[in-house]
Amino acid sequence: METELVYGDGAIKFIYDNPFGQLLAPIIASKPISQLYGCYQDWSISKNKVPPFVEKFSIDLSIYKAGSVSTENKENSYKSFNEFFIREFENNERTFIEDNDRMPAFCEARYFGHHEINDNVKIPVKGKLLNSKDLLGGSKWSSTFEGGPLLVARLCPVDYHRYHYPLSGRTLDSFQIKGQYHSVNPLALKSKPEIFIVNERRASILETEEFGKLAYIEVGAAMVGKIIQRHDESTLHRKGDEKGYFLFGGSTVILLGEKGKWSPSADILSNTKNGIETYLHLGDEVALRGSH
């Protein structure tokens, strides 16, 4: 078990715990502010943040590809903080499990999981009810996932910020759900537990052979300049294909399934009951086919 080092924890505590900060929260969580801050991360001056960030959070750059600047020192190879933020793994650094009865992790992230969404399912950090209708913004697809399994993958600013398709299949539908840009780290969730259903998000409805239909929901967060889609959704996707990435800021991917089709892995379910997230590498087992 590890204790998380939170990037910008002082600012987040001020915004969500301080009465004056709470007055400013709606402004800070607005799309223009997040986009403006995201633009700053594209400027060349922002590259100066990379070395101290790497040192503070003990990031092992040997497992990542270098940036676009030719230099012997990898931490100086990124032309901006955003280029560093969306760094890619070296080839073959992560592999996706091949067993068709096991779902691989679609993000390198911290996971919560529930066997089924119902009136008793709450976010462990502060008892906020979750349901498919709210998560999907009242979409026509909401009923497809009622009573089905749920995975929440939370990405921290220190993490790999590209997200992938867990399984081969096709996209049936995709749509944007407008909202705000609150932080998704634990400090913010404790103060404002409804963040997952008020933040801006993008949903894709996927059809897979082994695990049925999936709702793949990317949740925007404070200071996320953009959520970039990398795959042409009119074409088929394969297990492990990159779906997209988040520019600067921690964020979250939520996965919903059809009732009885699959269940989160036992360790995730057990840890979730105790309010503990399970950290997984990209491609590790995250769920099993069938009802367990």
Predicted regions and their residues:
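Contiguous, well-folded functional domains in the mature portion of proteins
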Residues: 1-292
